[in-house]
Amino acid sequence: MEENLESIEGYVDHIIYRNADNGYTVLVLVCNEEEETCVGVFSDIAEGENIKAKGSYTEHPTYGRQFQVKSFEEKAPQDEVAIERYLGSGAIKGIGIALAARIVRRFKADTFRIIEEEPERLAEIKGISQRKAMEIADQVNQKKDLRQAMIFLQQYGINTTLAVKIYKTYGLEIYGILKENPYRMADDVEGVGFRTADEIASRVGIRTDSDFRIRSGIQYVLLQAAGEGHTYLPMQELTQRASRLLEVDPEHIEQHYMNLAMDRKIIMRQVEDSTQIYAATYFYMEANTATRLTQLNAVFDVPDIEIEDRIRKIEKKTGMDLDEHQVEAVKEAVRNGVLVITGGPGTGKTTTINTIIRYFELSGEDIMLAAPTGRAAKRMSETTGYEARTIHRMLELNGGMEGNAGFERNEQNPLETNLIIIDEMSMVDISLMNSLLKAILPGTRLILVGDVNQLPSVGAGSVLKDIIDSKMFPTVMLTKIFRQASTSDIIVNAHKINRGEKVSLDNKSMDFFFLKRYEADKIINVTLQLIKQKLPKFVGASEYDIQVLTPMRKGLLGVERLNTILQMYLNPPSDRKKEKEHGAIVFREGDKVMQIKNNYQLEWEIRSKYGLCIDKGTGVFNGDTGIIEEINDFAETITVNFDEGRMVEYSYKLLDELELAYAVTIHKSQGSEYPAVVIPLLSGPRMLMNRNLLYTAVTRAKKCVTIVGDDTTFEQMIENNSQQRRYSGLKDRLLENKEEA
């Protein structure tokens, strides 16, 4: 409570640490000749400044007594010594210690009034020109403007970090914007979404039926829908959702569609008797994706006999023996600009890709391989013997925020290659596909490989399914389970699940087990025993490599509860391990964690065993997993070691982007492969507990699947082939392009 806060006042003697991104600062404040260590977020601070800070004293286990600053205000230096100290501190560029002394000697206690009201008089001092006098005055006034803006914004509950971003975006315009249309901030300022803007608007006194509020709310609903996988919403559904969110009558919502369309914030498409409404960004992503795929869909005239002769040479050299569908896939790859290869586990996708690679190598063609995630790319490299990268790295990510990634490879700087093969295509959303296609020159062959029966991408769109369903591009479906794969019950049962067939649960398998338990606590106890005692020896992997996959986030067997229990079991508290509490989560050194949103600006580096940086880049992505190496309370950072040794430093302000990953949702596991998976299973919502979800979970395991739970739920999931509909228009756009061609 504000009334319980203490106040201290003094000057900043020196700054120990400052994070320029979020304003977190550790400084020493001299108060009545006593030094106080102050810790907090400061919008703008410099050595020599006089401040009054409100907060409370705490005892840090390592650094001792500190004053935790909740708010502060700048105080004008009251005497000539304080004025000289401030001016000579470096806070004002161009004024050093000697010049500060001359200024104060000339103007004494009147110095700040002279700078603010009669800055030209500074030129009376030797070493200061009229131009320099104006520059000094500008700096002083800018700092004053920033402080006043901070006070203004904070009265509406805006924290210091966000207030700085807002001020940097609008400057002195912020006063008018906040009182007239705070919803502008949701468009312009990263970190201010509709919910934040709406809260500010409520405090400012904006009406709930304000035009600005309704338009911003409509855009927010479309953004939320994209998070659910939709690229558009039917008008009726959009109206209903927006009406519930805003608590405004539906007719008031519909009145604003045309204005938003005229401002090009949304795009409205009439398809038969339905109106589809897109956020403009997703409309153009779909349109561009359809256009560029159509442009790549060339036909190359290569005789059958020539292709077959080369395939035989490759088979003889490698010892591979292709079936008729695999041969067909190679032929289609040679003859077409775009090819889709799809099939379940053990159906020979890897053999087919390897043959295609060797075919084009014999022609001296340049080849690029990529996949959506680091794990998938690594697996692709291991199975082909050819370098594979993430799509982001192939496109040379240059940083940007979620939904606004920048790539060095684009229309102006395309990829220089003859063939691109993308694996795990079911994970690729419309945004990434759009960026990929922008960087591909016409004449380049593109092969898309994936399992269409897995869960769709986390991001918006149904890219792989729409491409296949359009029937515009040759698609080879591999269905034969090869001899080596047919000995694996993981693969055999995955295909049975996919076909809706009964799976034997007699546990006579060597890699697929079902342990029947019907109560959540008993399921959890068995899961703990498997991870800690039985599976590490059985599969020859560490307990950290065994992944718990669960259908839901909430509930008795949800991710949140399981992670708390698994953390206590696998990485309990220890005097040797530092912790950081963040909301309901306690992060601990040694914890397994996952990035839960794309952050294209986060920097990473790979270090040698001597600690030297041998590679670096930007971008950590939704689903990336790693281990917490270090928690640094002084710097307020957590360092995570991700796959491939990428070290990433998170400020405490970014911890919303991390969560524990001992257990993850099946959806989040897409594109990953683990030595062993454990799937705790009880009943859940019918739309979620379906065949598609179960199939995806089972196919994540390389050596062993163990399902612990209710066999009736397992059988119901196999029978349930219903899937939640995704609103995606790529198929229609492709067909429209075909008609126009």
Summary of predicted features, one role per range:
Residues 91, 124, 343, 371, ...:
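The Walker A (P-loop) glycine that initiates the GxxxxGKT/S ATP-binding motif of P-loop NTPases
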Residues 355, 359, 363-365, 374-383, ...:
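Conserved helicase motor core of SF1/SF2 NTP-dependent helicases
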Residues 615-618, 622-741:
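C-terminal accessory regions
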